[in-house]
């Protein structure tokens, strides 16, 4: 008789789709071991957290902040989250710098978790992707200015992917063991 799979809810909040890409990658890697439902925080369909054993929340940062729906989700579901095994990852370009690539040193994940007063069982941070060609002109210029100040990439014709997929795989293995 096989062991019953745990139920994992994977939720994401994304601006440009990369948080979704990472969550779908995690789903693919974990589907043999867990029963998984994946959904966007932007979807109208509300998942009942009580139906799941574990929750992974992935969220991107834009202009220094996680999206409003991430703050709202954690605040509105804090009581239920505290009863579950939880994992959270933040996706931000600041994490491309080694000194800001850990959950303890990345200012955006530190600030977010403090503000919502949540301490997930597993925390990760990834540098993500900068897709200049898909940005509209005002966003492209704003991010170009930020990259100029922070010594980041300035080639507007390219997609710059800083995702450390080995770190993503490490997070997935940790989730497998939750």
Predicted regions mapped to residue ranges:
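A short beta-strand-loop structural module common to alpha/beta enzyme folds
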Residues: 33-45
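Generic recognition of short, well-ordered alpha-helical segments
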Residues: 21, 50, 68-72
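Glycine-/small-residue-rich active-site loops that bind phosphorylated ligands and cofactors
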Residues: 15-18, 44, 62, 94-96
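A short, aliphatic-rich alpha-helical micro-motif
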Residues: 49-50, 81
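FMN-binding flavodoxin-like domain, especially the glycine-rich phosphate-binding loop
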Residues: 3-4, 29, 33, 59-178
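Short hydrophobic segments within beta-strands
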Residues: 10-13, 39, 89, 126
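N-terminal beta1-alpha1 ligand-phosphate binding loop
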Residues: 3-33
């Amino acid at each position: 008789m096989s062991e019953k799979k745990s139920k994992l809810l994977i939720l994401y909040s994304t601006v440009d789709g990369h948080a979704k890409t990472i969550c779908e990658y995690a789903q693919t890697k974990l589907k043999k071991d867990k029963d998984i439902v994946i959904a966007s925080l932007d979807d109208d369909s509300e998942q009942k957290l009580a139906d799941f054993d574990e929750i992974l929340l992935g969220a991107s940062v834009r202009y220094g902040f996680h999206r409003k729906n991430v703050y709202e989700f954690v605040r509105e579901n804090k009581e239920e989250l505290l009863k579950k095994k939880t994992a959270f990852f933040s996706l931000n370009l600041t994490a491309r710098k080694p000194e800001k690539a850990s959950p303890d040193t990345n200012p955006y994940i530190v600030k977010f978790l403090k503000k919502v007063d949540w301490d997930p069982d597993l925390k990760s941070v990834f540098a993500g992707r900068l897709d200049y060609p898909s940005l509209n002109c005002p966003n492209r210029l704003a991010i170009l200015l930020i990259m100029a100040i922070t010594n980041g990439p300035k080639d507007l014709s390219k997609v710059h992917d800083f995702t450390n997929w080995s770190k993503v795989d490490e997070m997935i293995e940790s989730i497998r063991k939750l």
